Amino acid sequence: MRILTKKLVMTIVGVILAAFLVIQLVPYGRAHSNPPVIMEPSWDSPITRDLTVKACFDCHSNQVVWPWYSNIAPISWWVQDHVVEGRSELNFSEWDRNQEEAYEAAETVLEGEMPPSYYKPWSRMSQTDLDNLVTGLEATLGTAKVEEHRDNDDDDD
């Protein structure tokens, strides 16, 4: 009985390992393209641009620094989808096209939706940097409901 269990475990591990190796052959997720930068916004300051690069550019620009793990399936599939979606929502490198949601960028940072908590945990931003990013994005891109959100936060105190 014990030999059968050990054999079953080894078979399962072997199948999982084989499946992992086979999915590495799927070409999707490793075409790490960075199209040319066409035009960036007129930044209100170099600090705003630097903070935006740190917090946003790896998903919302054509200047993505692809991490090493973006070459390993199935993580590569998720990273590729994330960048494609991010660029379609807001792309700081293609400012010549309509960026309908740009005015909401500051709000999403203020509400903690962006940058996502799983995004580059080794380079988390301080609260001061996040506040400066929100202020800079408001000045550069405009505002949505940021003031209303701030007023609601003040009411909670």
Label each PLM-derived region with a short phrase.
Residues 1-7:
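Short, Lys/Arg-rich N-terminal segment immediately upstream of the first membrane anchor
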Residues 10-27:
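Hydrophobic membrane-insertion alpha-helices, especially the h-region
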Residues 31-52:
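Electrostatic cytochrome c docking/interface patches
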Residues 52-64, 114, 133:
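The canonical Cys-X-X-Cys-His
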Residues 68-74:
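Short cysteine/histidine-rich zinc-coordinating motifs and their immediately flanking basic loops
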Residues 77-122:
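Extracytoplasmic electron-transfer domains, predominantly the class I c-type cytochrome c fold
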Residues 82-83, 144-157:
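Extracytoplasmic/periplasmic C-terminal soluble domains
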Residues 112, 120-148:
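C-terminal capping alpha-helices of c-type cytochrome domains
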